């Protein structure tokens, strides 16, 4: 009887743990990024001659849609990048540019990511766009139902990837206004494959006042 009780207790604990892992209770809470915090982020160009710039240069006059890529080789990130790129014609009409930032430049990862992303890509070595409160998802991600649903969705859509580079620090998407408009949209990835709403991105981009 004692062994049965122990066995049932272990099963019950496992089930309770699985249920808990699929709630948001164990997830690190994000801290909103202020426009001043993001504006002072140090970025580097990747194409051609490397140069450094402050992030505010990306949106000061035209606003911007910026994807903070969790990992360029991740097939879920490639899926979201492709979907954001589908908005490029509409963003161009609005005069709002599309950019991405990555944490690191590993091998050919950025080059291989380019077919999925229609905007310019910058290096954010200090990972400012992943803060100010960095959020990580490790093994917990692989027992979350939502993550597996995201895996299946992207796989069925034909996306492929690899395991190169750091992929546990979660990313997000920002829509930045011009001048003093501030952050118009901040989407923080809560789990692997948690995509931003394209409708929300476009709605926020339409609020940008582009300087002529």
From Swiss-Prot:
It is found in: Cytoplasm. This is Peroxiredoxin-like 2A. Residues 3-101 are annotated as: Thioredoxin fold. Pfam families: AhpC-TSA_2 (PF13911). One of its GO terms (cellular component) is cytoplasm. Belongs to the peroxiredoxin-like PRXL2 family. PRXL2A subfamily. The keyword Cytoplasm applies. Expressed in kidney marrow. Involved in redox regulation of the cell. Acts as an antioxidant. Keywords: Antioxidant, Cytoplasm, Redox-active center, Selenocysteine. The active site Cys-77 corresponds to one of the redox-active cysteines of peroxiredoxins. GO terms for molecular function: antioxidant activity. The active site is at 77 (redox-active).
